[in-house]
Swiss-Prot record:
Pathway: Lipid metabolism; leukotriene B4 degradation
Name of the protein this chain belongs to: Leukotriene-B4 omega-hydroxylase 3
CDD domains: CYP4F
Keywords attached to this entry: Endoplasmic reticulum, Heme, Iron, Membrane, Metal-binding, Microsome, Monooxygenase, Oxidoreductase
Stored PANTHER family: CYTOCHROME P450 FAMILY 4, LEUKOTRIENE-B4 OMEGA-HYDROXYLASE 3
Organism: Mus musculus
Gene Ontology MF annotations: heme binding; iron ion binding; leukotriene-B4 20-monooxygenase activity
Taxon lineage: Eukaryota, Metazoa, Chordata, Craniata, Vertebrata
Main function: Cytochromes P450 are a group of heme-thiolate monooxygenases. Catalyzes the omega-hydroxylation of LTB4.
Co-factor requirement: heme
SUPFAM superfamilies in the record: Cytochrome P450
Length: 524
């Protein structure tokens, strides 16, 4: 039969045997692959069997739609954490398992694993790549390790010290705007709107040494960043839109590409200008001129960075890291600070104690300005910030997909290739980690109370090798802005309680509104 089937090609019986052999080899290879997949699925099932799972909606949907990015979804997550305090297994449809870990003792193995073992889940982070390139947030492997080492000096306290002046100035601009709005009779303000512009204003000055005056007038670059952030958050909730081919055809996809072009052109123009400046001045003269102003911006540090072999970052790498810092630095800090203001508005006794601490620190000082050394002199204000970051973490979850099996401290195993969610919100709201977790209590972070706690019980900036490289920058900015705000204004809760909305960062549906009253001159 095989001879006849080949005769029309002009091939005789003598070539039939090799074809039979090839067909047999091909069939054997396919069968082997199927058996390997079956064995892997069986092996994974055995490991996954050790993780409890809530009842599925049905066999087809699995647990899809149980924990939604809404206030109700966070309440459901809180219920699940109370029921399964170590973590639980959920299914996306009938075939895709996702493990959620929500206890500080359990997440240690994942967070402390090397960046090469515990990779970020590429499915989500890939949608950021057209905007952020291979910056620290998106990259992996050797490239990530090299960039992390080269960027670490950018966040040394000697670099950060002069930024405190910028934080003061940007906060002053925001407060001047508040005073005008209040004098016009409007004292009800959306904290997210105002604080986001303030953090973008600071970042643009710290990253590019560029003042767009974005808090007072519109800026194409700032508008593009805000639009990109909104589009990414929207796309994150639409799994079908993860396919680039489909997304690029939609109106949102077209707006995304247009906004990317605006951001990239701005960053590229700054880099080109710095390259022109460096040859004209020479490196020594350039550093001397910067020393006079006492400020090296982020672009300067990236341009001057060299790895162990003396190689510099490419312009493409510099753009990716600058764009990443603008993205990561504004939304997370704005979320953190907005919720801090909200929590202090709801707890006037803590607000007043923070205010007195700031007043005592700045007594007799003109102008009223926070300096770098002051940041360590605000212990109660720092406790209030940390407790707010626990109760309302800006980033509620991080995802990992491990390249090898991960053994957990309790003996269970997370199989290679399984998506693992580390629920920062879940850990922070876990009653077996934090007693009465829904209560805002800054004294949890009193040095005497916190000393025996697990270092992984509080991870608003993640932890381990891939922790947030800019956490000192963020904490410094929040301290400055909060201290000056409490010095000048009284914060009061709005009549309507906000509904939390976990997107890329923790927001509030329709904004986070507070009432703001200026303090009399004699009050501070």
């Amino acid at each position: 039969m095989s001879q006849l089937s080949l005769s029309w090609l002009g091939l005789g019986p003598e070539v039939a045997f090799p074809w039979k052999t090839l067909l047999l080899l091909g069939a054997s290879w396919i069968l082997a692959r199927i058996l390997i997949q079956i064995y892997a699925a069986y092996r994974n099932y055995r490991h996954l069997h050790g993780f409890p799972q809530p009842p599925k909606r049905n066999w087809l949907m699995g647990h899809v739609g149980m924990v939604t990015p809404t206030e109700q979804g966070l309440k459901e997550l809180t219920r699940l954490v109370g029921t399964y305090p170590q973590g639980f297994l959920m299914w996306i449809g009938p075939m895709v398992p996702v493990i959620t870990l929500c206890h500080s003792d359990i997440v240690r193995s994942i967070l402390n694993a090397s960046a090469a073992v515990a990779l970020k889940d590429v499915i989500f982070y890939s949608i950021l790549k057209p905007w952020l390139g291979d910056g620290l947030l998106v990259s992996a492997g050797d490239k990530w390790s090299r960039h992390r080492r080269m960027l670490t000096p950018a966040f040394h306290f000697n670099i950060l010290k002069p930024y405190v002046k910028i934080f003061n100035d940007s906060t002053n601009i925001m407060h001047a705007k508040w005073q005008r709005l209040i004098s016009d009779g409007s004292a009800r303000l959306d904290m997210f709107e105002h604080v986001s512009l303030m953090t973008l204003d600071s970042l643009q000055k710290c990253v590019f040494s560029f003042d767009s005056n974005c808090q007072e007038k519109s800026s194409e670059y700032i508008a593009a960043i805000l639009e990109l952030s909104a589009l990414v958050a929207k796309r994150h909730q639409q799994p079908l839109m993860f396919m680039d081919l489909l997304y690029n055809l939609t109106p949102d996809g077209m707006r995304f590409r247009k906004a990317c072009n605006v951001v990239h052109e701005f960053t590229d123009a700054v880099i080109r200008e710095r390259h022109r400046t460096l040859p004209d001045q020479g490196l020594d003269d350039f550093l001397k001129s910067k020393a006079k102003s006492k400020t090296l911006d982020f672009i300067d540090v990236l341009l001057l960075s060299k790895d162990e072999d003396g190689k510099e970052l490419s312009d493409e790498d510099i753009r990716a890291e600058a764009d990443t810092f603008m993205f990561e630095g504004h939304d997370t800090t704005a979320s953190g600070l907005s919720w801090i203001l909200y929590n202090l508005a709801r707890h006037p006794e803590y607000q007043e104690r923070c205010r007195q601490e700031v007043q005592e620190l700045l007594r007799g000082r003109e102008p009223e300005e926070i300096e770098w050394d002051d940041l360590a002199q605000l212990p109660f204000l720092t406790m209030c910030i940390k407790e707010s970051l626990r109760l309302h973490p800006p980033v509620t979850v991080i995802s990992r997909c491990c390249t090898q099996d991960i053994l957990l401290p309790d003996g269970r195993t997370i199989p290679k290739g399984i998506i693992c969610l580390i629920s920062i919100f879940g850990i922070h709201h876990n009653p077996s980690v934090w007693p009465d977790p829904e209560v805002y209590d800054p004294f949890r972070f009193d040095p005497e109370n916190i000393k025996d706690s697990s270092p992984l019980a509080f991870i608003p900036f993640s932890a381990g090798p891939r922790n947030c490289i800019g956490q000192t920058f963020a904490m410094s900015e929040m301290k400055v802005a909060l201290a000056l705000t409490l010095l000048r204004f009284r914060l009061l809760p709005d009549d309507k309680e906000p509904r939390r909305q976990p997107e890329l960062i923790l927001r509030a549906e329709g904004g986070l509104w507070l009432r703001v009253e200026p303090l009399s001159a004699g009050a501070h």
